């Protein structure tokens, strides 16, 4: 997952998860990875394109019919808070949009903060 994940990152991940009959997502990384994982979990259980559910200017403004799949967030960075909230920031380069996705079912099912995974993170 690249920094500032894209809708295409999400759709690729959701497609892979569906093709392999995955039941849940494990998001191991920083805020971008966890945001992408939350939206992958949402699209694993809902039809269409992620932007169908975007409230942005060019989004479809649809309400997801199903809750997101379970998502285990394991943070490797400090300060994003993505492991404890239901929000995700996703970009769509072709529309030049970057927007918030926020659904109660996108709260991580389990969040893990392991200090051993953050030994290389700068203190500030």
Regions found by a protein language model. Give the residues of each.
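N-terminal small/polar loop signature for handling phosphorylated ligands or for N-terminal nucleophile
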Residues: 1-49
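A glycine/threonine-rich phosphate-anchoring loop and its flanking beta-alpha core
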Residues: 47-124
């Amino acid at each position: 997952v690249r920094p500032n994940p894209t809708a295409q990152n999400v759709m690729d991940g959701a497609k892979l998860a569906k093709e392999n009959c995955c039941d849940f997502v494990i998001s191991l990384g920083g805020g971008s990875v966890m945001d992408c994982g939350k939206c992958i979990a949402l699209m694993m259980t809902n039809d269409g394109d992620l932007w169908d559910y975007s409230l942005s200017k060019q989004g479809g403004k649809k309400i997801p019919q199903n809750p997101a799949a379970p998502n285990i967030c394991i943070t490797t960075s400090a300060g994003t808070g993505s492991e404890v909230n239901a929000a995700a920031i996703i970009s769509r380069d072709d529309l030049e949009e970057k927007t918030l996705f926020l659904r109660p079912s996108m709260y991580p099912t389990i969040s893990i903060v392991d200090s051993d995974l953050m030994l290389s993170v700068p203190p500030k």
